[in-house]
Amino acid sequence: MAKTVAYFYDPDVGNFHYGAGHPMKPHRLALTHSLVLHYGLYKKMIVFKPYQASQHDMCRFHSEDYIDFLQRVSPTNMQGFTKSLNAFNVGDDCPVFPGLFEFCSRYTGASLQGATQLNNKICDIAINWAGGLHHAKKFEASGFCYVNDIVIGILELLKYHPRVLYIDIDIHHGDGVQEAFYLTDRVMTVSFHKYGNYFFPGTGDMYEVGAESGRYYCLNVPLRDGIDDQSYKHLFQPVINQVVDFYQPTCIVLQCGADSLGCDRLGCFNLSIRGHGECVEYVKSFNIPLLVLGGGGYTVRNVARCWTYETSLLVEEAISEELPYSEYFEYFAPDFTLHPDVSTRIENQNSRQYLDQIRQTIFENLKMLNHAPSVQIRDVPAGLLTYDRTDEADAEERGPEENYSRPEAPNEFYDGDHDNDKESDVEI
């Protein structure tokens, strides 16, 4: 049976700009939405312009001092915040840019609203490609991330769900989410990422397993350069299958960072768009309520292709290999296809022996789990908002203009293949 899919897109989120030459480009969200729109995928989803998160919402996880700083600081007054900039790790990699707090409010609100709708059974799957900023910590920014929308969304899910499983397929370790839930068995975190050679953020060893009540509820899959579709699948599917079997989550949050694709400007993996999408499709196959988020991804045209393809998988709608014409069509030159060859010459350093060793260690750790930890019954806290689906127009009756307002960001357009030539060592 087809799932009900809610899709969250803020038409202004693509306007924000981290600064000249910065690898993180919110404009990729406008490209993604444009493809979703022109493929007609919006007809298969309930489309929402999302809620904007308040300071109070953000302080569910972050410190009040940090969030107050994010709201107050701007490029024009930042000289007066020198001490705070250092204290909160805001600077080169996490710059102060115009509308910083508003940007955080928009992507965080969408994840929070997605979680609320899953709680209220308005949808089976909620999609927020603007979210997934997994490095942000309680007291500081990190790796292009300011507010950890994932943690805030999971905290909302925990009002209704006894056990939430978090899966991260970004090339970078999901350190902010792991740190937030390191001591609890209510959330199990599973991260597949590049590890070693001082690769950011430097955490995510296989032996980081959680502590106290959360011991063995943190699972890391450290990978080496050049992993391809076959090797990734050899680990991903059996590991996730075992985790779901042992943990029995009642909800899943999936972070779909697209920097694990081949040809990503800041990545070193060799996944194809189909291989990346196969992970999403596999997680969907468990038929467990699912919050799908974005994350990293720095070759803009491939990020848009990847997340559009994964949207099509989530709504179970086949789409053509030829990209539909749109205002961003020239971004996808010279092939104008959905699945270009993104393989690189990076050698796959993940031998079958190495992958089998990881899998064996992970399975041994899973045996240490108590099956499906129980939660004491108590009153459910008030939800974020109350939704009435009758307020939504039928997808077939909505025109594209009701679902999409094109952002205009003249300073955000694609600068060519060398606009950020791997000089930064901090990424999502």
UniProtKB/Swiss-Prot annotation:
One of its GO terms (biological process) is negative regulation of transcription by RNA polymerase II. Keywords: Biological rhythms, Chromatin regulator, Chromosome, Cytoplasm, Hydrolase, Metal-binding, Nucleus, Phosphoprotein, Repressor, Transcription, Transcription regulation, Ubl conjugation, Zinc. Gene3D superfamilies: Histone deacetylase domain (3.40.800.20). Residues 388-405, 415-428 have a biased composition (Basic and acidic residues). Residues 388-428 are annotated as: Disordered. InterPro entries: HDAC_PDAC, His_deacetylse, His_deacetylse_1, His_deacetylse_dom, His_deacetylse_dom_sf, Ureohydrolase_dom_sf. The active site is at H135. Its main location: nucleus. The modification Phosphoserine is found at S424. SUPFAM superfamilies: Arginase/deacetylase. Residues 3-316 are annotated as: Histone deacetylase. GO terms for molecular function: chromatin binding; histone deacetylase activity, hydrolytic mechanism; histone decrotonylase activity; metal ion binding; protein de-2-hydroxyisobutyrylase activity; protein decrotonylase activity; protein lysine deacetylase activity; protein lysine delactylase activity. The keyword Nucleus applies. PANTHER family: HISTONE DEACETYLASE 3, HISTONE DEACETYLASE HDAC1-RELATED. This is Histone deacetylase 3. It comes from Pongo abelii. The gene is HDAC3.
